[in-house]
């Protein structure tokens, strides 16, 4: 999809507010129940002269917001693609209280979402129509609109990178290839990427991470990404992503039906890599480090077992209650490394961690636990800008006690109750200093969805790449 600013040509889209359908052809369409003007209502047709017409409903004028624009223009672009339209003209007036910059960004984002396809393994895949969008904003606001569109294009490139990583199967994306792609994609944008193999991980004494990786023939990789673009600041924010490229459950083996999509268990690492891509590509004024401890959780004669007691980089010991509660073990060492060795002053970890989160919040809302109200409020503000939802869960002492072991410092499963909170608090207990502002985000339901929602097609979503960019770049 190509965007031009202040240019005419192509099918002229007619933008219609629901309350302004009065008489004439639009009223005829409404009576025939072909077009109502409601948000997300799009109608494409040919007139008697075979001239294409495109009607885009915006709903009630006072209710329009960025998410309405994303969903509506996703529908519009989908209709254009279906009808193989190559050029469209959008004449966008000032909308409600939205600035031209954010309006253009949301419209472009929605349209770009419609272009995403995951069909690389299909032998009969077809070429998609390349659409040219001639975008005409309010007069005098061309520069602001162009900035918004350029930001959307780069953000969506990062989101699509995340979606591609998460969608690909475990025989294609495993620790070595994940590290290779991260290095290729991010170094091209100015991010320093260091990949540590098994020997370096052993030297770091990352025992929790190594125990999870033991049974796999794929060598574990510790992927460290560094982006420094704010020399005047002492703040260094860490992003830590769960990097399980396949999770069989280990000896606490999953049922066959639950294993089918476990190549997506590296969703946290995909989000982190995508966020780093966006931050660097858009030259955000921020210092960010990112850490991914990537491995597979498999079964072999050398695999770790329920009942084992293992160490960790922090020195804390862990009783293994369940080998399928492995993600928090890899995160434990990664979080400690980020805060102790890299000196992160704040940290966000993201993981497809618990089924409990999916049961509680479904596929449209991510769950979170945090130790810092102010830090979390920054995320909420970014979520609002991005159209993404993260719901904060309680962190009362009761949940912390559930992680205590009688034979070790901690156990890796707090039991059946409060599973999302106990898992998150387990991860947080490996901060090098307990007062480091920290947010744990469980994206088990949102990283990979089973049903289409709004402008997100089923499968990988790229969730929270946008929110992390807005939050860390202070663009929210």
UniProtKB/Swiss-Prot annotation:
NCBIfam families the UniProt entry points to: PRK00913.1-2, PRK00913.3-5
Cofactor descriptive note: Binds 2 manganese ions per subunit.
Main location as per UniProt: cytoplasm
Catalytic activity: Release of an N-terminal amino acid, Xaa-|-Yaa-, in which Xaa is preferably Leu, but may be other amino acids including Pro although not Arg or Lys, and Yaa may be Pro. Amino acid amides and methyl esters are also readily hydrolyzed, but rates on arylamides are exceedingly low; Release of an N-terminal amino acid, preferentially leucine, but not glutamic or aspartic acids
Cofactor: Mn(2+)
Active site (catalytic residues): 254, 328
InterPro entries: Leucine_aapep/pepB, Macro_dom-like, Peptidase_M17_C, Peptidase_M17_leu_NH2_pept, Peptidase_M17_N
Assigned protein family: Belongs to the peptidase M17 family.
Binding site for Mn(2+) 2: 242, 247, 265, 326
Main enzyme class: hydrolase
Pfam families cross-referenced by the UniProt entry: Peptidase_M17, Peptidase_M17_N
The protein's role, per its UniProt record: Presumably involved in the processing and regular turnover of intracellular proteins. Catalyzes the removal of unsubstituted N-terminal amino acids from various peptides.
Keyword Phosphoprotein set for record: no
Organism field: Treponema denticola (strain ATCC 35405 / DSM 14222 / CIP 103919 / JCM 8153 / KCTC 15104)
GO cellular component assignments: cytoplasm
Stored PROSITE patterns: CYTOSOL_AP
A GO MF term: metalloaminopeptidase activity
Key words, A-Z: Aminopeptidase, Cytoplasm, Hydrolase, Manganese, Metal-binding, Protease
Residues holding Mn(2+) 1: 247, 324, 326
GO biological process annotation, one example: proteolysis
Subcellular location, record wording: Cytoplasm
EC number, UniProt record: 3.4.11.1, 3.4.11.10
Protein name according to UniProt: Probable cytosol aminopeptidase
Record SUPFAM superfamilies: Macro domain-like, Zn-dependent exopeptidases
């Amino acid at each position: 999809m190509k965007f031009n600013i202040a240019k005419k040509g192509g099918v002229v889209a007619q933008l219609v507010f629901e309350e302004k359908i009065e008489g004439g052809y639009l009223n005829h369409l409404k009576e025939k129940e072909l077009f109502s003007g409601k948000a997300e209502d799009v109608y494409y047709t040919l007139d008697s002269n075979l001239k294409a017409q495109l009607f885009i409903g915006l709903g009630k004028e006072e209710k329009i917001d960025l998410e309405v624009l994303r969903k509506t223009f996703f529908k519009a672009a989908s209709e254009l693609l279906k009808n193989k339209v190559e050029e469209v003209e959008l004449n966008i007036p000032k909308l409600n209280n939205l600035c031209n910059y954010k309006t253009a960004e949301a419209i472009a984002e929605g349209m770009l979402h419609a272009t995403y396809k995951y069909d690389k393994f299909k032998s009969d895949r077809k070429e998609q129509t390349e659409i040219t969008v001639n975008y005409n904003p309010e007069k005098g606001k061309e520069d602001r609109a162009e900035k918004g569109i350029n930001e959307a294009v780069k953000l969506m490139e990062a989101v699509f990178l995340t979606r591609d990583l998460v969608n690909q199967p475990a025989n294609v994306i495993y620790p070595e290839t994940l590290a290779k792609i991260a290095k290729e994609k991010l170094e091209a944008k100015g991010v320093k990427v260091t990949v540590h193999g098994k020997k370096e991980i052993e030297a770091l004494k990352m025992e929790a991470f190594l125990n999870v990786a033991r049974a796999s023939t794929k060598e574990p990789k510790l992927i460290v990404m560094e982006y420094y673009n704010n020399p005047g600041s002492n703040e260094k924010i860490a992003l830590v992503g769960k990097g399980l490229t396949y999770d069989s459950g280990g000896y606490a083996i999953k049922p066959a039906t639950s294993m089918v999509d476990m190549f997506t268990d590296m969703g946290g690492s995909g989000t982190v890599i995508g966020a780093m891509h966006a931050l660097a590509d858009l030259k955000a004024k921020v210092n960010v480090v990112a850490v991914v401890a990537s491995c597979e959780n498999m079964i072999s004669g050398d695999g770790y077992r329920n009942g084992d007691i293992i160490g960790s980089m922090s020195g804390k010991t862990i009783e293994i209650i369940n080998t399928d509660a492995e993600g928090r073990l890899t995160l434990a060492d990664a979080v400690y490394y980020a805060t102790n060795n890299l000196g992160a002053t704040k940290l966000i970890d993201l993981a497809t961690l618990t089924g409990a989160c999916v049961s509680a919040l479904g596929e449209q809302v991510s769950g979170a636990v945090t130790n810092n109200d102010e830090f979390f409020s920054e995320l909420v503000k970014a979520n609002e800008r991005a159209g993404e939802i993260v719901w904060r869960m309680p962190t009362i002492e009761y949940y912390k006690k559930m992680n205590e072991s009688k034979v070790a410092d901690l156990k890796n499963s707090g039991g059946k109750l409060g599973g999302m909170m106990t898992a998150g608090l387990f991860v947080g207990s490996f901060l090098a200093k307990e007062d480091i502002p920290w947010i744990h985000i469980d994206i088990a339901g949102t990283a990979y969805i089973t049903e289409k929602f709004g402008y997100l097609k089923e499968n990988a979503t790229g969730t929270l790449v946008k929110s992390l960019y807005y939050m860390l770049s202070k663009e929210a």
